[in-house]
């Protein structure tokens, strides 16, 4: 055990040494600020199901839709075979109805990649649509696209392996919620879904904005993970009735017609059950980095704000709750990440909490503000 203690100290030393790397050439700051009136093209990859595995994905989807500057080109539903039985397109159709959008969905590859450079071409045609959609969207976009991935990263890596040049010229960032920041003995759930896809992503050299799910093992956050907890009452206390219905439908694994359910009156007993629950979250307001949003104090409250929306333009006057710092990482064949410059290492941007004491309550407040805007006038323009 003493030997393991030394190894852990060395591992953590790599991390802190890596954090002092100077930001140099070629990398933009996290989340290019959205210009007034200009949408940010986004491909969203998620392991969203109905009935759910974990309804945190429903909160993330709703938060994404609450940011009208994000032009969601399409949603790739992870783990295609499971999608046939438990379709994530159901909550997407509900969010489309609530916001007036018309975002398409496609299902992704069915089985894990066999190697980091696997193109997934041996999988059947019904599961190729996700990879094909990613490639087609990148080709068609006049501006670089942001890709957010919440799940296995399988379809993104297979698409990259088919068209690496296209990715290098037309991907603005890959915002990846996956992995463990500091414990080499712990394999995080999303990595376990497809270890070779994770290896492929971390070796790709793409502009990866890495958001580890944990830092220090299961349910731990030492400052480089996005994990936090919230009560449903705090998140949804000001949400519109159709948004409450959306979450009741998800949490209670409803089987009735999903769009009609949104317009039914909220039943007090079901709302009480919803509000009594709590949720583990990882994404939500963090998704705003794709358009340059930051979780900042605006007067007497914390919001997920676009640049300039709080009277600040960045710099010393604006103190975001979290951000990203550039690090050098390498990853072995088992998906274990090491820090520091070495042969085969690549630069990524690593998530960091800048105010640990305030992180959880302020993430609750900022996410609640976004969710409160859904279903209300001006919350999201049709796209």
Segments the model singles out, each with a brief description of its role:
Residues 35-39, 44, 84-141, 334, ...:
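Metal-dependent C-N hydrolase catalytic cores
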Residues 37-40, 59-67, 71, 192, ...:
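Conformational coupling and interaction surfaces
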Residues 106, 175, 288:
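Residues in well-ordered beta-strands of folded domains
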Residues 28-36:
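Boundary at the C-terminal end of the N-terminal hydrophobic targeting segment
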Residues 1-10:
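N-terminal secretory signal peptides that target proteins for export/translocation
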Residues 37-89, 116-230:
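Active-site histidine-anchored catalytic micro-motif
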Residues 95-100, 200, 233-236:
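Short, conserved catalytic or adaptor-binding loops enriched in Gly and charged residues
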Residues 10-26:
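Bacterial N-terminal signal peptides
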């Amino acid at each position: 055990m003493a030997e393991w203690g030394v190894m852990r100290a060395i591992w953590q030393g790599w991390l802190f040494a890596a954090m002092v790397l100077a930001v140099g050439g070629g990398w933009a700051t996290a989340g290019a600020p959205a210009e007034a009136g200009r949408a940010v093209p986004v491909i969203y990859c998620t392991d969203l199901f109905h009935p759910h595995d974990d309804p945190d994905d429903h909160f993330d989807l709703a938060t994404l839709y609450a940011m009208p500057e994000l032009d969601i080109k399409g949603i790739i539903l992870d783990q295609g075979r499971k999608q046939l039985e438990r379709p994530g397109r159901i909550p997407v159709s509900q969010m489309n109805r609530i916001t007036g959008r018309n975002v398409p969905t496609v299902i992704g590859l069915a089985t894990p990649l066999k190697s980091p450079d696997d193109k997934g071409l041996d999988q059947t045609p019904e599961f190729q649509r996700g990879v094909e959609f990613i490639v087609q969207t990148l080709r068609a976009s006049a501006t670089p696209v942001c890709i957010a991935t919440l799940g296995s990263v399988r379809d993104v890596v297979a698409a990259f392996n088919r068209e690496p040049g296209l990715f290098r010229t037309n991907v603005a960032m890959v915002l990846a919620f996956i992995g463990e920041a500091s414990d080499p003995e712990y394999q995080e759930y999303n990595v376990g879904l497809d270890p070779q896809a994770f290896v492929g992503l971390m070796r790709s050299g793409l502009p990866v904005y890495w958001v580890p799910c944990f830092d220090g093992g299961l349910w731990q956050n030492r400052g480089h993970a996005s994990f936090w907890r919230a009560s449903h009452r705090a998140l949804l206390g000001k949400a519109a009735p159709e948004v409450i219905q959306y979450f009741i439908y998800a949490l209670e694994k409803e089987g009735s017609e999903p769009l009609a359910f949104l317009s039914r009156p909220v039943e007090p007993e079901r709302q009480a059950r919803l509000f009594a629950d709590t949720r583990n979250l990882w994404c939500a307001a963090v998704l705003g980095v794709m358009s340059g949003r930051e979780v900042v104090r605006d007067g007497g409250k914390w919001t997920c704000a676009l640049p300039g929306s709080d009277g600040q333009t960045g710099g010393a006057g604006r103190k975001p709750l979290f951000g990203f710092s550039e690090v050098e990482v390498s990853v072995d064949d088992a998906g274990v990440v090491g820090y520091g410059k070495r042969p085969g290492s690549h630069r990524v941007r690593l998530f960091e909490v800048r105010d640990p004491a305030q992180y959880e309550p302020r993430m609750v407040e900022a996410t609640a503000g976004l969710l409160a805007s859904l279903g209300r006038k001006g919350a999201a323009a049709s796209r």
